[in-house]
Amino acid sequence: FGTHIELLEMCELKAYREEVSDGELKRKLDEFYDKFNVEASCSSEELVRAARTSVALDKLVNVHQLGAMAYYYEGFCGNDYENIVTSVIAGNTLLTGYGIPVAGECEVKNAQAMKIMSLLKAGGSFSEFYAMDFKDDIVLLGHYGPAHFAIAEEKVKLVPLPLYHGKPGKGLSIQMSVKPGDVTLLSVCEGRDGVFLLAAEGEAV
């Protein structure tokens, strides 16, 4: 693809996070309430934590002129970096919706596939296969990380998770259902002869 990759540092994101002003924080919280259906169970502390991280992510993207991002980080024993990484989902979802797709699990190829779908105005949201019912020809897919507003059936919900699955900590996450209709799955793959695209078509029901 000729992709230029920047290796980003958590300490840089932390520095931007510490510089967030009260005005920036208020504007980001207003953006949350505009873009998300914020569940009443979301605490003000978690909303502020996620909003502060979202502002920092915006700055990181602008400074490095990022067109997409892939990340993975766990942190350690509740340290500052864990506090950051457990509050990124809301901000990453906003970036994804604004054409800067963000993929978890440090999946660079997935971020590239999301970028292609975004440029085609087809959304682009990381998803994982959960189960396949060959008898009824049904595939179950889902994910609890960042998503894309364009494929949501209703306004995307912002909800609290008391415990993250597969990683430490807790924080805000999003909930959405894919709108019924035609869907396209796209993967960027690499084989013996180089990079290729793998696509599938289906229907969301």
PLM region spans:
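A charged, amphipathic alpha-helical module
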Residues: 1-83
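Anaerobic metallocofactor- and corrinoid-dependent redox/one-carbon enzyme cores
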Residues: 49-205
